[in-house]
Amino acid sequence: MALTMTLKEELARVPVAATPERRAETAAMLRFAGGLHLVAGRVVVEAELDHGASVRRLRAAITELYGLAPEIVVVSGGNLRRGQRYVLRVVRGGEDLARQTGLIDQRGRPVRGLAPALVSGTTAATAAVWRGALLAHGSLTEPGRSAALEVTTPGPEAALALVGAARRLHVAAKAREVRQSDRVVVRDGEAIATLLAAVGAEQTATLWRERRERKEVRATANRLANFDDANLRRSAQAAVMAGAKVERALEILGDEVPDHLRYAGRLRLEHKQASLDELGRLADPPMTKDAVAGRIRRLLAMADKRAAERGIPGTDAASEG
């Protein structure tokens, strides 16, 4: 929870001058934190957030972009909920706001995913969509085996749209249903840091990387303390050589690497001291150690074949250097 609040605190302060990006962020916040209600025949837009600065940012954007005056109601946490919740409502002009932000179409019908304009915008607008989604319903957990950057979505259509937006930012995300709730999850360590930086959370990205590195160092120290010194040296040397070969293979192949082989290679590079068995457990979804070893072998073989065709040093050159 601490990292989530740190992230939202930083995102709520990200300056955005361009109107298209502000509109994209606002629309995303309303989509992922909001809902539509009919009150006495009028459309009311409502959004519920757990962070004061975020709801104030949303209110300011709605006022400045659309000339409307949202009201904010503070709801104290009860037995099942910790902390305060902030409910933003737009009653007067709610239908116009819903239409302009893509919550309903021109005929007044609810839009289930994200409006086409949000999905096909510029890179900056795409980052704004993710920033809005994180402010609305995002969470960031501590580095470790269960580390994740996650957004709870109102439905599968919005989840798939957010996955597509992540892809445009060169980040692999997955849509999942967890306890009857649709979510978008980013688990790869480097991908999490990349996405955090893309949405403007540079300080949180740095903090997350530092904690991740410290955790890996501690885990490595704890694991290696159980080994005999000679075995330790041999294991460490083998891991360094394997990592160097994989790095050389990815360099040789560039964009030609199949996704499943690239994933195995990135696992090896991100966890250089881990055994194949541990790499398999770290994979998402988990793999056997034989499956991990097989993918890495195929990656190296593919790279060596391509290196031979191009007349350049293969993967063995990395370990020799």
From Swiss-Prot:
GO terms for molecular function: DNA binding. InterPro entries: Homing_endonucl, Sporu_reg_WhiA_N_dom, Sporulation_regulator_WhiA, Sporulation_regulator_WhiA_C, WhiA_LAGLIDADG_dom. One of its GO terms (biological process) is cell division. The keyword Cell division applies. Keywords: Cell cycle, Cell division, DNA-binding. Pfam families: HTH_WhiA, LAGLIDADG_WhiA, WhiA_N. Residues 275-308 bind DNA. Gene3D superfamilies: Homing endonucleases. Belongs to the WhiA family. HAMAP family: HTH_type_WhiA. Involved in cell division and chromosome segregation. This is Probable cell division protein WhiA. It comes from Micrococcus luteus (strain ATCC 4698 / DSM 20030 / JCM 1464 / CCM 169 / CCUG 5858 / IAM 1056 / NBRC 3333 / NCIMB 9278 / NCTC 2665 / VKM Ac-2230). The gene is whiA.
